[in-house]
Amino acid sequence: MTTIELRQLLLDDLGEIEEIERRSYPTPWSRSMFVGELAKPSSICLGAFEAEGEDGALVGYLIVSRYVDAWHVMNVAVDPDHRGRGVATMLLERLFDLTADDARRGYTLEVRVSNEKAIDLYERLGFRSRGLRRGYYTDNREDALIMCKDPVTLA
């Protein structure tokens, strides 16, 4: 089994990010969208890489923006050849670890209503459906399910 290492994404990773994005989504983000998120101090941009003993390739990534009241998951993608191996779970769990001191914000995301595997993953990690954004996706006007993970209540 492949060993995965998580680290902050860098501008040097853009080529691999874009390749995974193109292989994952019908309407991929532009390079400028990735550059903008990578440059924002309020963003968390994590990459999952094969361990150095292997080829060190990027196999997945997570991009999150800090909003006033929530951490918003902007983009999660895993290379199709590495799906089903827990990469997205590792990335999201690292997000929760990194934001533990600020978890009162909670977490939000949108996901295609047809993406049952992603919805199942998010539910396993504590996200719950909070509504729909009708016609959200521009490629086919598919609805997005709005999901939220409530802030951690500190005793």
Locations of regions flagged by a protein language model:
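Terminal substrate-recognition subdomain of acyl/acetyltransferases
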Residues: D139-A155
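Residue-level detector of beta-propeller blades
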Residues: L58, S129-G131
